[in-house]
Each structure stands twice: as C-alpha cells, then as structure tokens.
Amino acid sequence: MISTSDFKNGTNILVDGEPYQIAWFQNHKPGKGGAVMRVKLRHLKKGGIIERTFKSGEKFKALTITRQKKRFLYKESNNFNFMDMDTYEQITVHPELLGKMVNFLKENLEVEAIYLENELIGIDLPVIIEMTIAEAEHGIKGDSVSNTTKTAKLETGADIHVPLFIKEGDRIKVDTRTGEYVERA
C-alpha cells in the first residue's frame, strides 16, 4: 500500500479499481479542515487524464509496470505478431491496442511491450525510426512561396508530408510520436 505522502510523478496506483499513473500532484492545506492532495492521474489502459482530490494519508495499492523488449515479426489478417527477444515466445496484439502506431510497424522493428501486473497494456515504439519512401508525388519546381511539402507513402502504407526534394526509394527518419518527417537517413 502507498500513502498520499509517498506520491511521486510516475507512481502507478489503483484508484476505484482502475490503473492510473500520477502525472502531477500538489499538497493543499485549506484554512479549515484537514490537508488534501490534489492529483492528476493518467489512465494506464485508456490514456485519458482525470483530476482527483484525496484526503491526506489515504492509502492505495501500488501497481507494478514492467517493460520487455519485443521484435515485430509480421501482420496476420488483423493482428500483429511480436517475438520476445529473450525467450523467443510469440504474442499476438490486436490493432486497438496499437492505435496509430500500426503506421510505423515494419518487420524486425524492436519495440518495448508494457505490462501491468502481467497484462499487456501497450507497446512503445522507438521515437525516431528509419523508413523507405514507397511512393512520392512530384513536387512543382520553384514552388517555394506556398506549402513546401508533398505527400508521400511509406513502406508500411502510411501517408506522410515530406519536403519537395524527397523521392521514391529515399530513406528518411520519422518521429513516431507525431508522424512527421525529421530528416533524410
């Protein structure tokens, strides 16, 4: 059990039967009554943030989060298959758990699987990954006044905006958090 006096940013706790991570907290002592702890909590499975106030000294169950290195192997129908880097055990992940990350999953990409009490709750991609341009529109030469990007398709099928000089077959670096072009590889 963990008390409100032990709160730290990043601490994982169970609140009303749901797993949360403390994103922010502040001890508040009003003029009347006992001290309270104001907290912003990030839901570990859904990702949303809520604000709650707890009485000082209230206790919560601490949760254990573990990370394991996995390698993306292949997509089979609607599921994505990963292999544990240590045990070579394979797991199947549904696309709902991955969200927009599916746009950046290519074969043999190393990722981190996030487990909450032995239940897979998410996958973390590397922040910057190298991808190949599969298709690219032709840019209009001399068009530097208006929008200086064009749409290109990555090897995974995802669309991305790239500078005009990028052409089919080029290797680029992509930020997986924003889905934006970073630089040539």
Swiss-Prot record:
First-listed, main subcellular location of the protein, grouped into a coarse class: cytoplasm
Keywords: Cytoplasm, Elongation factor, Protein biosynthesis
SMART domains assigned to the protein according to its UniProt record, in alphabetical order: EFP, Elong-fact-P_C
Protein name: Elongation factor P
Organism of origin: Endomicrobium trichonymphae
Family annotation (InterPro entries): Elong-fact-P_C, NA-bd_OB-fold, Rib_uL2_dom2, Transl_elong_fac_P/YeiP, Transl_elong_KOW-like, Transl_elong_P/YeiP_cen, Transl_elong_P/YeiP_CS, Transl_elongation_fac_P
Gene3D superfamilies for the chain: 2.30.30.30, Nucleic acid-binding proteins (2.40.50.140)
Pfam families the UniProt entry points to: EFP (PF01132), EFP_N (PF08207), Elong-fact-P_C (PF09285)
Described purpose of this protein according to its UniProt entry: Involved in peptide bond synthesis. Stimulates efficient translation and peptide-bond synthesis on native or reconstituted 70S ribosomes in vitro. Probably functions indirectly by altering the affinity of the ribosome for aminoacyl-tRNA, thus increasing their reactivity as acceptors for peptidyl transferase.
Pathway assigned to this chain's UniProt record: Protein biosynthesis; polypeptide chain elongation
Family, per entry: Belongs to the elongation factor P family.
GO cellular component terms, semicolon-separated: cytoplasm
